[in-house]
């Protein structure tokens, strides 16, 4: 992870990872709120 000369910028990786985490949490909480996530 110390190599900053990689092909993928670190900010891009962090942005994608953040959006993915928010999306997964959003779907999980939405499913639990609507009663569909109780089976997960």
Swiss-Prot record:
<dbReference type="GO" id="GO:0033115">
    <property type="term" value="C:cyanelle thylakoid membrane"/>
</dbReference>
<dbReference type="InterPro" id="IPR002682">
    <property type="entry name" value="PSII_PsbJ"/>
</dbReference>
<dbReference type="Pfam" id="PF01788">
    <property type="entry name" value="PsbJ"/>
</dbReference>
<keyword id="KW-0793">Thylakoid</keyword>
<comment type="subunit">
    <text>PSII is composed of 1 copy each of membrane proteins PsbA, PsbB, PsbC, PsbD, PsbE, PsbF, PsbH, PsbI, PsbJ, PsbK, PsbL, PsbM, PsbT, PsbX, PsbY, PsbZ, Psb30/Ycf12, at least 3 peripheral proteins of the oxygen-evolving complex and a large number of cofactors. It forms dimeric complexes.</text>
</comment>
<keyword id="KW-1133">Transmembrane helix</keyword>
<keyword id="KW-0472">Membrane</keyword>
<keyword id="KW-0934">Plastid</keyword>
<keyword id="KW-0604">Photosystem II</keyword>
<dbReference type="GO" id="GO:0015979">
    <property type="term" value="P:photosynthesis"/>
</dbReference>
<feature type="transmembrane region" description="Helical">
    <location>
        <begin position="8"/>
        <end position="28"/>
    </location>
</feature>
<dbReference type="InterPro" id="IPR037267">
    <property type="entry name" value="PSII_PsbJ_sf"/>
</dbReference>
<keyword id="KW-0674">Reaction center</keyword>
<keyword id="KW-0812">Transmembrane</keyword>
<dbReference type="GO" id="GO:0009539">
    <property type="term" value="C:photosystem II reaction center"/>
</dbReference>
<comment type="similarity">
    <text>Belongs to the PsbJ family.</text>
</comment>
<protein>
    <recommendedName>
        <fullName>Photosystem II reaction center protein J</fullName>
    </recommendedName>
</protein>
<keyword id="KW-0602">Photosynthesis</keyword>
<keyword id="KW-0194">Cyanelle</keyword>
<comment type="function">
    <text>One of the components of the core complex of photosystem II (PSII). PSII is a light-driven water:plastoquinone oxidoreductase that uses light energy to abstract electrons from H(2)O, generating O(2) and a proton gradient subsequently used for ATP formation. It consists of a core antenna complex that captures photons, and an electron transfer chain that converts photonic excitation into a charge separation.</text>
</comment>
